[in-house]
Amino acid sequence: MGKKGKKSGYADWEDDLGEDISGQNEYLDNTSQDSPQNDELAEKSENLAVSSEKTTSKKKKGKKNKGNKNQVSDDESQELESPQGPKELTAVTELDDDEFDYKPKKGKKGKKSKKVEEDDEPQEIESPQGPKELTAVTELDDDEFDYKPKKGKKGKKAQNNNESEAAAPPEIPEVRVKTKKEKEREKKEREKLRKKQQQAKKKGSTGEDTLASSEVSSEVDISTPAENDSSAKGKQAAGSKRKGPNVTALQKMLEEKRAREEEEQRIREEEARIAEEEKRLAEVEEARKEEARLKKKEKERKKKEEMKAQGKYLSKKQKEQQALAQRRLQQMLESGVRVAGLSNGEKKQKPVYTNKKKSNRSGTSSISSSGILESSPATSISVDEPQKDSKDDSEKVEKETEVERKEENEAEAEAVFDDWEAALEEPEVAENNEVVTEKKETDIKSDAVEHSIKDKEDSKTDKVDDIPQAAPAESNVSESDLRSPICCILGHVDTGKTKLLDNLRRSNVQEGEAGGITQQIGATYFPIESIKQKTKVVNKKGKLQYNIPGLLIIDTPGHESFTNLRSRGTSLCNIAILVIDIMHGLEPQTIESIRLLRDQKTPFVVALNKVDRLYGWHSIKDNAIQDSLSKQKKAIQREFRDRVESIILQLNEQGLNAALYFENKNLGRYVSLVPTSAQSGEGVPDLVALLISLTQTRMSDRIKYITTLECTVLEVKVIEGLGATIDVILSNGVLHEGDRIVLCGMGGPIITTVRALLTPQPLKEMRVKSAYVHHKEIKAAMGVKICANDLEKAVAGSRLLVVGPDDDEEDLAEEIMEDLENLLGRIDTSGIGVSVQASTLGSLEALLEFLKQMKIPVASVNIGPVYKKDVMRCATMLEKAKEYALMLCFDVKVDRDAEDLAEQLGVKIFSANVIYHLFDAFTAHQKKILEQKREESSDVAVFPCVLKTVAAFNKRDPIILGVDVVEGVLRINTPIVAVKQLPNGEPQIIELGRVASLEMNHKPVDKVKKGQAGAGVAMKLESSGSQILFGRQVTESDALYSHITRQSIDSLKDPAFRDEVSRDEWQLIIQLKKLFGII
């Protein structure tokens, strides 16, 4: 089709729209209500799109204008509702907003501005296939259309602009034919826009409605080649005014949307951070709870072990029985019954007789047979008691039987109680009929006291044996029954511990010991008669009361064994005596003993022994120390005071306050010092009296008799006629002949039956052979010798347990073997180390502790004599580590065959009866081995040094130089080198030779340290084979160094040389490593 076709197309389109253009006011009125022209415009555009294939490029131009008009009208709806290409459309919209904000301002300033076409707005994307390409085209159209209005401002008319646009068809992109679905979609979108505009018109003013209708008509007129410039300008102005608010609202919505998304993103990030923090806190809290749970579990385990060690651990069955007994006791107390065992330990009360006779008189046989209850004389309580106690009759059958057996023997005493009770009951009933229950209970207590007093005066035939039967099962402590306190003597070697005991018991044990040094634990029991006789000198006025049955004193060889006994958890020692030599003051083992006593919180007194060593001291045998001191000369008293103050100062340095016992006003804060002399016995009565006073007054709770058994094995000995026996310390409880006992053995737990219980004669040492006293049962505290089967392999120092009726032997066996397992845990698992053999567990632990401090591994341990099998086991070290092929044997016999085998195999056996001698012998052997190692490694071990040449006396074969030691130590046989830097930066090492001899001040020396030689040292070097001329290859200005290597550094780390290398020398080695390039 040619121009004619094109014109006819335009004519038809203008005819269709002519009425609207001519009657614009009428159209605006109609569009305020409805806009049917949009539907007609859509139909026209569809027909035009079908016929556009046959038109020229100019006609395509007209179709494009029409399409742009439709797209412009639907811009906002597509931005909000169409999900395709949000990012590209957003960018285009922002560009459009800037243009629309700019163009209306120009329209207001120019009175006759050119018509701005709707094509100035960017084209919307018509299909999702090419969003990027369409965006680019849109941006290109924007640039072109932004340029054309500027030309219109220079005087050109709107119609000429339209014609110029029509005359440039190549610049307009070709528009494709829309499908039916696309047309329907556009139609729907226009319908949505129309409804949206209607809603906006209802809210706006009449002027805004007019502007909105003008916009619609202007959009239609823009696509039509209008001829009236004034109408076109009016439409353009209306369109510009309408577009501004809509685009601003859209931009505002987009900003709100963007702000909302950013806020949501921030909230999500904050929630994620909070969640992560909560998770971390939860993990921390969980870890804390887990740690607390583990600590609690460990605490419960330790508490359980401690209770087991003390014999206080109860099985489930025992706990149930105890709870049942407690409930029954509570029921009795609530019913008004009073238990004798809980009456503050009033031993004088005899409630068993009162209850029995009163209940017989009132017809209540159940109370009379119970033997442990005391009821009120009040009638109301007597009536209630049968109902309460009838429930317990079946549980008290045994006690009833025992009491009935004694009724005949107690008839006379019962009659006395009957008369006394009848006399007291009549006024009681008459006076207290209206008294409250509290008054009755008070009267019951007062009656019981009166009854006890009368019973003591009138009835002296009462049997004391009934008292233990009256004690309830719940109470295992009798407050009026104190056992013998256990006292331990500690102190440094040769301070006079055993000699002090010899003075107490009038014995001479110390002289019979090997080297005069105690090697084993010994126990001596002092009966109260002996104590009274000993303290008679200081108790002339009779102020000191004796409430304990005796005193058990344990003599220890040192802190090691005492630690071993304390580690078992037994309360073996109640009070301790720390012996200090007044001439020497505090010594190393004394300080160790103080630390041990402080850790165990054991109270102690200090015996300042050997006061008779003071020059000029006049001894008075077995005298009180205050009396003896007052009879000495003034000079001796001054020296005594000086030495005491010096020891007090040393104790203060250890954190202890101390004072002489007769000047001590605060026993709780100050340690008492008792001057003594083991030779003359002076001060010994003061010491014993102080021990008795402290234990009775300040420690009565700790020495109460407890039925729970606590027993520790001290020694294992073979006695002629008795066989293998064990010496034990019975701290608490009772041992009976025939008891089933469990103790620790080298081959496993030992379960046997007691055949005999023996004790030494009073004031006799348990270690000394003497006649023994046989016992059917022994009460704590006492040193006891037990005869039983299978005791040969018993471990000295371990606990002893008695199998009760409700105990399981296997459980006790596992518990008792824990002591040995803890000891075996110290053995080196690598299998390389020395073999240790000892007589007791305590001495074995002392040896192991010493070897641990010396950092010497232990491969095997054993208790008892040394046999061939022990030597064979030790001989395996000859292949692994020859220096550890030795045995340390303390206080044990070595079999003759074992000695011969050890000599053949090359195993060294160290045996000693004094543990300190064994330490010395082993230390000397170690030094000898180290010296051999040093000699063997002397060529390899090179000590670091830096030398400065002072003078050259001989420059070749041999080189003799005068040098000064700048750093380190110069020794004989040290290789000396000079180091020069090559042009490439690498060090060049020039060997001069080894040091053959050293002279300082014309005297030969083996080594010279830094700063030791003021005028220098003459050093002779033996040539290493290379012909070096001092002065040619090496000059006096060159520094000289000892030639160290990686092998020499490793040899210095060996124990043979490690102690000889100082910290400064190690720093010098680090510097020389960099110089010689050693890695």
UniProtKB/Swiss-Prot annotation:
Protein's recorded name: Eukaryotic translation initiation factor 5B
Catalyzed reactions per annotation: GTP + H2O = GDP + phosphate + H(+)
Positions of the UniProt region annotated as G2: 516-520
Low complexity bias: start-end ranges: 160-169, 321-334, 361-376
Binding of GTP, residues: 491-498
Gene3D superfamilies xref list: P-loop containing nucleotide triphosphate hydrolases, Translation factors, Translation initiation factor IF- 2, domain 3
GO terms under biological process: cytoplasmic translational initiation; translational initiation
Protein family per UniProt: Belongs to the TRAFAC class translation factor GTPase superfamily. Classic translation factor GTPase family. IF-2 subfamily.
Region listing for G5, in residue ranges: 677-679
Residue ranges of the region described as Disordered: 1-478
Region named G3: 555-558
Record region (G4): 609-612
Taxonomic placement: Eukaryota, Fungi, Dikarya, Ascomycota, Taphrinomycotina
Basic and acidic residues composition bias: residue spans: 173-192, 253-293, 385-408, 436-466
